[in-house]
Structure formats: structure tokens, C-alpha cells
């Protein structure tokens, strides 16, 4: 067993592409080795902004020898009319190094038995350039030199070592060898690697921490140590830590500061300037107040660190000066003046202005406020917030820091005298900003956020701007997923079709299928029964909360003894009703059996209270009240009676069963086998 090292040296890779790139390289290497039957124990990944590297441990010296059968021509064309081997069979056998007489007939085809010898690891690995590296794909490419080769960034060097032997191959004008390179500034020299096993220990000696997880742990430890020394609190934000880790090869954390006068600017602005724009970690005192300091990480050692600190402070102060200016100037603006100007700001060229979008959102929000049971005072707040909630788009601060949309709206609204509910709704209407992001906390904010998302989705669908495949430029999938999460959290019950009707020419089915797909995705992240999820999302009305609750309730009963017969009896009813051309009115006078009357009575008793029953109670009623009555009905009644009036009456009775149960789910889609 041997170890193999592959290192691809590159120009600086964008931070967000480093981790996906090394993961892809490892996956492609694993697939390549498996395809070539070259066994190994594990693949260890290394990555920095300038290199992607792998060590394959426990590699076999050669690939596995195998005996295989190769499928050839069919028996129908194997011989000619005289019984001689055909040209097709002769050509096939020749290609396999055999004679026609060596072939084996299995069923309708001839097969050649073939022994495939093992291939030396060196020979297989010499194809890594073409079969692994050249086949990598990226969201962003670069082209260099006079060729058509594309890669994430230009390749500068390649190391390819099987233990202490070079496995040579060429990729463009780069020949794989044993020479890596150190840190760009601290050790900008070639580093000779005598053995693949030297990599992890040799590179840190040249100021390159190639192990990304070790480097991240080192960054975390340094930041926490500096925070502790200064009695600060600091949060190691996951995404920021990942980004910083992927822009340095040899990290050294340091402390910087800024004038406390800038603390008069809202903390969110300062944090955005530091964290999002400069990749700094903000720090807080022990009372949880933002301190006029930050922690950052340089790509180098502590030499001349004071110059690095001054440079970073200077860059930050420039941004804080802008922030302070906008904060003061924006407070001179009036909300009503900014709202008036939104009529000239385009929401989308095919849809209209932001003012028009807000007007539609206000109408939707009013309906939602009724559905949500808001108080009259809350409804006033919903209306007011819907009238102004986009005003901060025209402030200087949001123009400079667009990440602060909504956040600044809340602050400026409070300064202008708007009440807390209205101000909070302005901030919360963007929520959630990610798949698992925070949801609005207030009722008014929840209504506004949902209404804004409903109008956005319906508006884009109305003009034909519909997501296809992975293409979703207007983030409509995210909007719908956020809408679903808000509706579920607030436990709102309403049919989404109510809001689609306000748009002329809407393709209702297309929109509902789009939303249904998002509900399905969310449910399948939590439940393992696809059929139960399908049944729930195909209920007779488009009540998202009902769909979600139904799926969980049905799934919770799937192992109970009455589950199977109950589902089968309801499904039988559904299938019979589906076959009926027309459904008549029920006439109890046509009942001939007691079980018909009993089923009718069960349906009527449930109908009177069905709308307001929770899903759990609905399902228990279906299992324990309705299903036994259906079973008795089927045991004692011939549904397809010769008397057409009696037959139609029985189908009509079953249609009422279906109407009742389908409010919860389409039970015919559940597999009981």
C-alpha cells in the first residue's frame, strides 16, 4: 500500500469557490480510482486560496485483475444461411482476442470471456491530468494563454508523487513534478517534496497551513484569545470564518480600533461595514454593547503587523465616515416625500413601479389581516406599513449599504414617529432571508411579509417570468418557501387561490403546482413517506397549513392497526366516485339497507363540525367513525346495483364521503401494501 499526492497550484481562487473546488476534486479522484479498479483506503483533502491538494492513502500498487463477460451480437445474426459464422460475430470475437468458437451463448446473445490484467498504479495515475483535473467544472472560469482550456484560475504548478516517485503528466504547458511553492510573500520559493508523505509537515515550514480545518481552528483560537485578553465578547460567524479561512494561507489575527464617535451610528450599520464589507469580526463589551474595536486576520505572520493594523483601520474609517454622513442626512428626509418618489422606481419593467407593487400588497395584506384575526388597531398598522414599507430604498444609507434594507427603514420610521408595530413590520417584511432564516415575530410584520411575497410571486408569474430548472433570477422559490414557513408558524388557514383571482389571465394551475412543489420539498425534509406527503398536498383546497398538518398527522398514525383498513376503504370510495360520469343528489328515500342510512348519518354528523376540527381530530373521525361505516356499507351493499337510480344514489353517498375526506388529503395516493 502506498500514498499518492496531487497538488494543483493556482492563482488566487475566490474565497467562495475554494471549498466547492476541493470537494469536487476529491469526488472526481474517488470516481476515477473506482472506475480504474484501483483500491485505496481514504482521500485526505487540503486547500488554500492558492492550491487544491489531495493525498490518497493506502493505494494499491496496481488495479484489480478481473474476468468479465463482454456482450456480443445476438444469436439471430451470428450465422449465415449456410451455418457459417457471420462477419458480425467474427469481428466481435477478433476485437476481444478470441475466436467465434470461444464465445458462449447465453439466452439470445453471444458473450466473450475476457481476462483483464491489473494495471500499475503509476500508469493509471498518469491520466489524472486529463481524466480528473481537466474534467472539473466551475461556476466561474478563467482562460489563459493561447488555448481553449478553462479552469477556476490559471494553473501555475502541479505536484504528482506516488510515495517518492514522480508520476509525470502534462497539462497545457505545466509538467507535474515534485516542486510545490511556499507562501507568496513569506516563502516565495520552490519547495522540493521528496515524498508524498512530507506534504502536511513540509508546507507549514514554508508558511502554508494546507489543512483547511486545522487553519480554521487556528484562526478561531487566535480570535478567541485576543477577545479574552481584551475582555470582549466575539461571535465566530460561520460564514465569515469560512470566508476568512479561504483567503489566507498563514493566518495571524490582530486587533484594530476606530473612533468611539462612530458608535452614534446604529450598530447594524457598523457591523455591516466591518463584517460584510471588510471581513472583520466585531466585538462587544461584557454588557453586550458594540465596542469601538474589531478583530481581523492577515495572510502572513506578525512581522510589521502595526502597519497592517493602521491600513485596516484607515479603510474602515473611510466607510464609517460615509455611514455617519448618510445617517445624519437621511434623518432630514420625510417618509411621505420618499414614498411619493417610489412611483418612478421600477419594480420590474414588465410589472411596473414599486408604488404599484405596494398598492397590490396593501390589498393582499388587508385580506390576510382578516384571515389572521388581527384587531382593528393591528389592521390600521398593517395598512400604514403597507403604504410606506419600501421608502428606505431611496435613503442614502440603503443606497450605500443595500444589505440594510428594512433595518434602516425601521430605524428611520421610529425617528419619524411611526409606532413600533409599523416600524418592525418594515424590517420584518424581508424575512426570512434564507431557507432557515429568522421569521417575523410580530403579527403585523408576518402579514406584510406574506403579502409582499404573494404579490411578488403572482406578479412575475402573470408576465411569464417563471423559474425553470435551476434558473430562478427573481428568487421566487425562496419567496414561496418563506411564505410557507410564515403561514405554518402563524397557523393561518386560507385557500391561496383567493389571492390568485385578482390577476387577470393567471395560470392558476401553474402557480399552485409551483407552490405545491415547495410544500412538498419542506415536508420531505422532515417525513420519509413520499406517498403520504403526496396525499396531503393534493387535498381538495389549497390550505397550506392544512397540507402541512395533515401530512404530519397521517404520518403519525401510519403504524397504528386501524390505519390500513381505514385508508383502503376511503380509497375504494374515491376510486368508485372517479369513475362516475355525473354525481346525483342524495335521496335518503332510495336507501335499501341500514348500512346506507348509517353511513349517511355518519357523514352528516361529521359535516356539521368538519370545518373547525383540527387535523388530528379529523383523522381520528375518519378512522374510527367514517371508515367502519364505509366498511359495513361495502360489506352489505352492491354499489353498482341494476337499478340505475339506486346505483347513482349510492355513488352520490360515496361522493359525500370523498368530499369530506379530501379536505384533509387524497387518501387514494397512500400505499398500504
UniProtKB/Swiss-Prot annotation:
Keywords: Aminoacyl-tRNA synthetase, ATP-binding, Cytoplasm, Ligase, Nucleotide-binding, Protein biosynthesis. GO terms for biological process: glycyl-tRNA aminoacylation. Its EC number is 6.1.1.14. Pfam families: tRNA_synt_2f. NCBIfam families: glyS. SUPFAM superfamilies: HD-domain/PDEase-like. This is Glycine--tRNA ligase beta subunit. InterPro entries: Gly-tRNA-synth_bsu (IPR015944), Gly-tRNA-synth_heterodimer (IPR006194). Belongs to the class-II aminoacyl-tRNA synthetase family. It is an enzyme of class 6 (ligase). It catalyses: tRNA(Gly) + glycine + ATP = glycyl-tRNA(Gly) + AMP + diphosphate. One of its GO terms (cellular component) is cytosol. The lineage of its organism: Bacteria, Bacillati, Bacillota, Bacilli, Lactobacillales. Tetramer of two alpha and two beta subunits. It is found in: Cytoplasm. The keyword Ligase applies. It comes from the Bacteria. Its main location: cytoplasm. GO terms for molecular function: ATP binding; glycine-tRNA ligase activity.
